[in-house]
């Protein structure tokens, strides 16, 4: 039985004061799922200070594909690791769309995170046009395959996947539980072709307008192991409610 995992993605939101209130609220609650928050880089030290010793993990929203060097503005996995990060998001659709990240770049970032003991949360997903054209499996399959090709089975065993239909992020639209389950099952099957044991243990999260009122139905699906939560992760009550769905 896979333990549910709920990760909050704050995106480019937050302030020292607001974060403190949010994190204290999350810490004060309890959840059935494992909880984590992925904060902007400047707030990782604050997360470490406030969450260290708690049941809530923390992580970053991106990491460089490079280990070190003359890469102005980049943040390396070793730097992120110094702030106690458990997770790092790689390949979020907003990074792919706005920063031109390729499948190969995403795979390189996942590999770099693993080298420094950080769990990469590899995000895959299709646009509305791709879904309507019947290309969902081809698109997410290609995105996942780049990662499968770059990692050993042992490395793959330390990866979390997240399916985030681009058309359901921040739009208020949500994939039906059946639509989401179908893609999750497809992704697990693709991992199983590489290693069945890894596939059975791998957490595959759903991201796309998850809220307290739809989380339970989504999380009841066989291959949905939790959520990657955007807007609802900025309110402690909503985030905890999802963690208890």
UniProtKB/Swiss-Prot annotation:
GO terms for cellular component: cytosol. It is found in: Cytoplasm. Keywords: Cytoplasm, Gluconeogenesis, Glycolysis, Isomerase. One of its GO terms (biological process) is glycolytic process. It holds the Pfam family TIM. The active site is at 92 (electrophile), 164 (proton acceptor). The keyword Iron-sulfur does not apply. PROSITE patterns: TIM_1, TIM_2. Its EC number is 5.3.1.1. InterPro entries: Aldolase_TIM, TIM_sf, TrioseP_Isoase_bac/euk, Triosephosphate_isomerase, Triosephosphate_isomerase_AS. Pathway: Carbohydrate biosynthesis; gluconeogenesis; Carbohydrate degradation; glycolysis; D-glyceraldehyde 3-phosphate from glycerone phosphate: step 1/1. Its main location: cytoplasm. Involved in the gluconeogenesis. Catalyzes stereospecifically the conversion of dihydroxyacetone phosphate (DHAP) to D-glyceraldehyde-3-phosphate (G3P). This is Triosephosphate isomerase. It comes from Cupriavidus necator (strain ATCC 17699 / DSM 428 / KCTC 22496 / NCIMB 10442 / H16 / Stanier 337).
